[in-house]
């Protein structure tokens, strides 16, 4: 009996010992155990489309910062970072004050230390206790959010002359206790979806989509972006701490489309965001794809990403729906594009439809598309590109040299395509990107032609480019379609705008055409690709020796003023996989022709007080005879430069080789849009007797092939050197825009090179790649987040 009582007492003592006598049998201390932060535990993690947030009490903010400083310290460095905010941004974190006191800690799902745990995002954070220095003396908290299956990055905008309509996926509920969605206009007026008619809105709620229609006259806000007026619908859906954007921008109502179509995309997240946030977040465009065309211009400012496309590539027409008396037509267009921001996990898909007012005929609706704009914005920063994919070994690269950024708006050069009847047409691309004065970025890319792809068969993979700002090296990169009037959908084109990326690739199926052409009084010009006149380059050493004794302003050697005419003969031996080209060497024009050009306004005289940007375009193409005297392959370099002539080449003429295509070339006046007297003094090429007139001294030089260098590959460089008074003519060839081409409202004046429809301007190119290195922008484009 006494034994059982002793057992009972022993059990009781063992139970009460830790509470009554802690000093008798000490157990493990609780000091080293992490304790949850009492203030943080009362708050709940809020999950949004791209990030999760947690409200931190003021008493724990310093402890959280101490932990962040420790985990974000560089490896091997014992010093704490001086600028914590910059490190937080790079790591996908954000710590900012809240309305009701305390702070809001936000972490992107793609941020540092965020792990994917089954179907959840998980982040473990710690908050040091006051005065603690060891990790064991910290409070731990785990942030966890489920992965959202619904893709909310889609928006469709329909711009009608009388209303604006926005369609978006229906936002999912994050929890069972979420309040119903309400309409918020300008962040002030709030109404339920059932009372939307009181605000003048029409709401259509489907199974997966929500469509809201607003009249243009009442609720829209007028806004100026790049000297362009817009009508903005500042509409949001709000519920508790969540907000869902229905903002959309449409151009002003017009009956005649302009030369370019601009799509304005707000720089904001399209998913669920935190409502009422004071954060002004900066989103960085990284990737862009336009579905309908491969020629477009990209720019951005603080609030918008602007994509501009030539009107002729998108415009369509339809009969007016309300036309009763007259059969009028209504012009419209549709643009589908994808835009990816560096701070978002998935790209946004944007669709814009715009309908113009009805007009009497199709010609009236498209009249303004052939008229270039007169108002141009300020200059923009230069971009360069590097190939992201390895081009074929047989395709020579098209190199774009660096040019310094000028304070004055630089001239931009648009490179247009020219068709060639080869089985596999080699391509080269240009892309023009400049920097506006406000720190925006402009990118013009047109890598391929849909008309050429129809002849080529299967399309090549879509082009991709990583573009990043470079404050000092603008590069010229652009190209145009072969048929300007073609408005059908074309292949997709990708432009990547990576702030930290240093590589890009542009694959284009377009050949170069660098020399303009004008009509003249001679016989009609019919060019054939079958006859071939083989002309070799005059060696630079030989020409320099002849130039040393020739009189001033004379493009020919002294004592040899006679001319010889070389008649072309039909080529009897076909060249496999490569057509025969008509090659002719153009001597310099006469002063009388210069005077006529000056009277016609086709020559630009640069201001001597301002520096002029002079681009250099180098194209590499094999000669007609692909093997030199040594039997090794010979490559030909063509250098078309508008810079001042060097001392040794001061008096030499242009000795570049050009090729022409086999079809009737249209009159350039059809593009100019005005009746202009034809210029005289132009060389003529007929079909019966195709002739190339050269100087006797030059013919003597062409009969000899220069010796190949020891490296094996013969490299000939043909750089046009302008005699006195001719540098303005060279500038006119590259800086005189044709009225048939349109100017971007986002870039400075662009001088258009002639397209493939003009005679004598086909420069055989190859599938090219362009290289560059870009630096990230220092400007901060921030957008308020509701």
From Swiss-Prot:
Q: Which InterPro entries match?
A: C1orf127-like (IPR027956), DUF4556 (IPR049521), ZP1/4_Ig-like (IPR054554)
Against Pfam families, the record matches this protein to: DUF4556 (PF15094), ZP1_ZP4_Ig-like (PF22821)
Tissue distribution is: Expressed specifically by cells of the ciliated left-right organizer.
Q: Does the keyword Methyltransferase apply?
A: no
What keywords tag this UniProt record? Answer: Signal
Per the record, its GO cellular-component terms are: extracellular region
Q: What is this protein called?
A: Ciliated left-right organizer ZP-N domains-containing protein
- Organism (species): Mus musculus
What gene is it encoded by? Ciroz
């Amino acid at each position: 009996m006494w034994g059982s009582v002793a057992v009972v007492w022993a059990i009781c003592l063992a139970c009460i010992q830790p509470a009554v006598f802690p000093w008798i049998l000490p157990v493990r201390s609780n000091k080293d155990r992490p304790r949850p932060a009492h203030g943080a535990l009362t708050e709940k993690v809020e999950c949004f489309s791209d990030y999760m947030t947690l409200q931190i009490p003021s008493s724990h903010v310093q402890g959280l910062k101490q932990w962040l400083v420790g985990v974000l310290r560089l490896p091997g460095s014992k010093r704490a970072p001086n600028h914590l905010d910059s490190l937080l941004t790079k790591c996908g974190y954000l710590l900012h004050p809240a309305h009701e006191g305390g702070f809001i800690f936000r972490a992107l799902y793609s941020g540092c230390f965020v792990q994917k745990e089954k179907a959840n995002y998980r982040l473990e954070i710690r908050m040091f206790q006051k005065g603690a220095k060891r990790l064991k003396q910290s409070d731990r908290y785990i942030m966890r959010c489920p992965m959202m299956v619904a893709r909310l990055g889609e928006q469709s905008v329909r711009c009608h002359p009388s209303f604006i309509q926005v369609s978006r996926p229906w936002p999912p509920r994050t929890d069972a206790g979420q309040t119903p969605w309400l309409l918020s206009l300008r962040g002030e007026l709030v109404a339920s979806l059932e009372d939307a008619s009181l605000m003048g809105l029409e709401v259509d709620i489907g199974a997966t989509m929500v469509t809201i229609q607003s009249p243009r006259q009442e609720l829209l806000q007028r806004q100026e972006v790049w000297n362009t007026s817009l009508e903005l619908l500042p509409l949001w859906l709000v519920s508790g701490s969540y907000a869902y954007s229905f903002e959309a921008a449409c151009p002003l109502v017009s009956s005649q489309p302009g030369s370019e179509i601009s799509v304005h995309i707000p720089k904001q997240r399209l998913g669920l965001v935190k409502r009422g946030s004071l954060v002004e977040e900066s989103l960085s465009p990284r990737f862009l794809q336009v579905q309908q065309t491969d020629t477009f211009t990209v720019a951005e400012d603080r609030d918008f990403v602007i994509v501009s496309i030539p009107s002729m590539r998108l415009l369509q027409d339809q009969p007016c729906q309300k036309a009763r008396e007259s059969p009028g037509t209504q012009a419209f267009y549709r643009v589908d594009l994808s835009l990816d921001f560096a701070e978002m996990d998935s790209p946004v898909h944007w669709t814009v439809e715009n309908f113009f007012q009805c007009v009497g005929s199709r010609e009236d609706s498209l009249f303004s598309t052939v008229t270039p704009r007169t108002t141009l914005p300020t200059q923009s920063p230069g971009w360069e590109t590097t190939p992201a994919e390895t081009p074929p070994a047989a395709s020579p690269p098209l190199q774009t040299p660096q040019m310094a950024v000028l304070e004055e708006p630089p001239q931009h050069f648009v490179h247009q395509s020219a068709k060639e009847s080869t089985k596999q047409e080699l391509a080269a691309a240009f892309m023009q990107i400049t920097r506006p004065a406000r720190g925006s970025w402009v990118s013009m890319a047109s890598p391929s032609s849909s008309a050429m792809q129809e002849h080529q068969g299967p399309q090549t993979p879509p082009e991709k480019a990583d573009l990043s700002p470079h404050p000092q090296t603008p590069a010229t990169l652009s190209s145009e379609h072969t048929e300007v009037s073609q408005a059908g959908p074309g292949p997709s084109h990708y432009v990547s705008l990576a702030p930290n990326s240093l590589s890009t690739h542009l694959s284009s199926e377009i050949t170069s055409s660098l020399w303009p052409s004008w009509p003249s009084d001679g016989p009609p010009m019919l060019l054939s690709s079958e006859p071939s006149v083989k002309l070799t380059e005059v060696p630079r050493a030989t020409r320099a020796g002849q130039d040393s004794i020739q009189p001033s302003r004379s493009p020919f050697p002294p004592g040899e003023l006679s001319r010889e005419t070389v008649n072309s003969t039909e080529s009897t031996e076909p060249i496999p996989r490569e057509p025969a080209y008509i090659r002719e060497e153009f001597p310099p024009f006469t002063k009388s022709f210069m005077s006529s050009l000056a009277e016609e306004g086709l020559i630009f005289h640069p201001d001597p007080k301002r520096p002029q940007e002079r681009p250099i375009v180098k194209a590499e193409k094999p000669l007609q005879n692909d093997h030199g005297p040594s039997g090794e392959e010979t490559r030909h370099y063509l250098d078309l430069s508008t810079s001042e002539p060097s001392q040794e080449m001061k008096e030499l003429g242009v000795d570049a080789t050009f090729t022409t295509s086999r079809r009737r070339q249209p009159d350039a006046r059809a593009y100019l849009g005005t009746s202009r007297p034809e210029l005289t003094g132009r060389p003529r090429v007929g079909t019966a007797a195709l002739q190339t007139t050269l100087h006797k001294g030059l013919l003597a030089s062409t009969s000899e092939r220069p010796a190949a260098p020891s490296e094996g590959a013969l490299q000939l460089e043909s750089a046009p050197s302008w005699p006195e008074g001719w540098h303005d003519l060279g500038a006119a060839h590259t800086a005189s825009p044709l009225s048939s081409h349109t100017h971007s409202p986002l870039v400075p004046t662009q001088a258009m090179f002639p397209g493939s429809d003009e005679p004598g301007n086909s420069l055989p190119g190859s599938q090219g790649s362009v290289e560059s290195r870009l630096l990230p922008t220092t400007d901060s484009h921030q957008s308020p987040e509701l």
